[in-house]
Amino acid sequence: AVVGVVGPNGAGKTTLFRLLTGKEKPDAGAVKLGETVKFSYVDQERSALPAGKNLWEAITDGLDRVMLGKKEVNSRAYVASFNFTGPDQQKPVDSLSGGERNRAHMARMMRDPGNVLLLDEPTNDLDIHTLRALELGLANYAGCCIVISHDRWFLDRLCTHILAFEGESVARYFEGNW
């Protein structure tokens, strides 16, 4: 399932992710997760790339082969699928542009062994080729995905469910997309 989370700025979409991941505590009540839930989370800041490494090392941990779910693939080919080819894979992560940083986070997160992906505005700073790679990656992902986005076109193409924050602490959940 791919759940799209929509709503106006300040409605609590990012707070929902922070509550799910334990980065924030609820004012009342409790957040209960299943025992097997393991999150892979990319926030809007895209700050988790390891400093002092090149792009390929940051995405693959320097491994020649990486696991994608239960499938083992060549790490250079995997990084290239996010539009990082040849010398781009050797760029220091500290020199990446916003769009490159976003693509690198997506690539790193998609190989993480989590079973629930949390994506906060994943389409920001993406070019059309990377957007398509993200769509294909999510379509083939074996787990669940929860996506916060204002990009209705993206949500229409991927979502099986929508959680719509409507303000004043009202939210609706329904099957289908926009």
Where are these predicted regions, by residue range?
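ABC ATP-binding cassette signature C-motif
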Residues: 1-178
